[in-house]
Amino acid sequence: MTKTIYKPWGKEVWLELNDKYCYKRIYINAGNKTSYQYHHHKLETNYLIEGTAEVWLENDDGVVDKKMMNPGDFFTIEPPKKHRVIAITDIILQEVSTPEVNDVVRIEDDSNRSDGKIEHEHARPVLCILTAGLGKRMGGLCSHINKGLLPLDNKALISHLIDKTSKDYEIVVALGYKGEMVKEYCEAAHPDRKFIFVNVDNYEGPGSGPAYSISQCKEHLQRPFVWAVADTIITNPLPPLETDWLGLYPTDIPELYSTADVEDDVIVNFKDKSKDGYNYAFIGIAGVYDYSTFWKEINVSSGEIVSAYYNINNYSHIKAKYFDWYDAGTIDNYLKAQKGVGKTKQYSIPKTNGEFLYKIDSTFIKLSSNKSFISGRIARAKQLEGLCPPLSYKGNNVYSYQWIAGKTLYECNDPKIWKDFLSFAQTHMWSKEPHPMQEPCVKFYKDKTHDRLKLFLSRRDSSYQEAHTINGVKTPPIKKLLKVLEKEDLYTGIPTKLFHGDLQFDNIVYGDDKSFYLIDWREDFGGGEIGDVCYDLAKMYGGILMSYSHMREQENFSCICSGQEVFFKYSTEPSLKGFVNFYENWLKSNNFNVSKIKTLTALIFLNMAPLHEKEFGDLLFFQSKLMLSSIE
C-alpha cells in the first residue's frame, strides 16, 4: 500500500518499505530544495525520471561537487556523505535505499526542520472548512440552507473548495447552522473523501465566530492544514502546503477587509479592516504549516480567526499567494460568482421552497429543508423500484442517485418517443389498487389548493383577488373560478401505487439503453402512498401545454400586469404544440375524462404558483385562471 509524505518542497510517495529496502518516488517543486543533509547508515540510489536538477554530492575527498542532471541521470549516496537536490524545474526522482528511512541529519533546512522523522509530515494533510455561521449577509437565501450549500455551477460552494484538494487530504468540517444538511451533502457528494465533522456548540451570539469555530477543531489540526471559510471561491489550484501562506487579492478598499503588506511575495505586515491598510485583501483561505505558532497566536475570545496573523513577525515567514477569487458571502457577490464561475445548468425551474438540486460528476443530489419530504421520496423510491434509479445515499435532508445516461423527453423532442412512453406507462405504471379515493383527493385537490392560493395571495396585492382581462380574455375573480372544486367527479380518482406525482417530460428520461426511467417523483398523494392516475395524466398535460424545460430560463417567458389587464407569453416547441391534439385524443380513446384532466391541470398551475419566483409564479396563476374560465 502506497503512502504519501508531504514535504516543504513537495512530496514523497513510498511504494514499498520492508526490512530490506525502501522504494519511493520523490516530487520536488521547481525552485525548491531538499535539506543539506547526510545519513549515518542509509545507502540510496536516485534516478532522475523527469525535469532538471542541480545535485550536490560530497566526493571521496570531502569536497561537495555540484552537477546539473537531466532525465536518465542517476547518483548514489553513500553514508555519511553530504548531499542536496535543487529542483530547477519540477522534478521526479526514483529512489531505492536501505530501510533506515528516518536516518537523516539536517545540516541546513529552509523550514528549520530537526533531524530524523518529522511526525506531521507523515500525517495526512487536512483542509478545514468553516460552515458554522448563520450566513446573515445572505438574507433570505439562507433561510432554508447553510450558505456553504448554496449552489454554484451545479455544486455547493464547499464542493469548490473540496475539489481543489487532492484525495490525500482529510476534510474537517466545522458544523453549526443546519449542520446536519452540510454533513449529509458532503457524504452524498464526496463519498470517496475522508471527512471529520465537528459540531460547534456556539455558532451564534456572544463568543461565537470563526476563531471559536476553528478552535473546536483544534484536536484534528495538530499538523499542517489549510483552512477556508465556506463562501470563499477560488478558480486556481491550491498551492502546496510547504510553508505558511495567506490567500490574497488586490483591493483599493482596505477598510472592508483584512489586508497584507507584501515584499518579494512575503507578508511583512497585516491589518484588519483599516483605512490605513494595504493593497492586498486577505480572502479567507490560508495554509498553516507552522501550526504550533498559529494556535499560540489566535485569540479565540475575539471571534476573529485573522487574529492569528496580527503579530505576523512571530512566524518565520508567511508567503503571499494570489488567487482569482469570488467572495460569495453577500447576495450581490454570490450573484456575481454565479455569472463568473461557469454556466450553471438549470435541471428544473427555480423554486423558493427550500429544495436544491446538485450534479457532481455522475451523482445527482436532491436536498430539502423538509425532512418529511425527503423521507417520503426515499420510501416511494422503494415502491417505484425498477422505474426510478436506485438511491445511492439516503439521509434526513438529502438523497442521491447516479445520473442516467440519456435524454429527458423534452430533450428528445420526438413525438414517436413520447407515444412510446404512453404505451410504457400503461404497461408498467398505474396498476389499479382497491382503495377509497374520496378523502385523499379532497385533501390533495381541494384543501391543498385553498392553502396554496392563500400562500400565493399573501405575497401579492389585493388586485390579484379581482377579475382580470388576460391576453384579451375576461376572467372572473379566482375565488369564483374555484367553484369548480365543488364538482364531485373531481374526487373520484383512479387509485394506484405506481403513480409518479410529477409526471412531466423533464422527469422522464429516455436512456441510452432505450429504456424509460422516472426521476423527481412525488413523495405522497394527500399524505398517503396511493395516488390518482388522473393526476399523473394532468401533470403530463400541463408539461405538454407549457414546456417546463423552457421555463428554466427567464428570457423564455414574460408576464406583465397593469391593474386588471394582464398579458403573458411563453415559448414552446412546435412539436409539443402538435402533440396536444394527439394527447387529448389518446385520453379520450383510453376512456379518461378530458374535461377533468384539464381542470386538474389548471389547479396544478395554481398550486405551482406560490412555489416559484414572482414573474413565473404570476404567469402560472394567470394561466390557471385562463384555463379555469374556459372549462365548462
Model-derived segments and spans:
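ATP-binding glycine-rich loop module of kinase domains
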Residues: 349-378, 402-403, 409-412
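Active-site activation/catalytic loop segments of kinase-like enzymes and analogous catalytic loops
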Residues: 524-585, 602-616
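Conserved alpha/beta core of the MobA/IspD/sugar-nucleotide pyrophosphorylase nucleotidyltransferase superfamily
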Residues: 106, 118-127, 279-353, 359
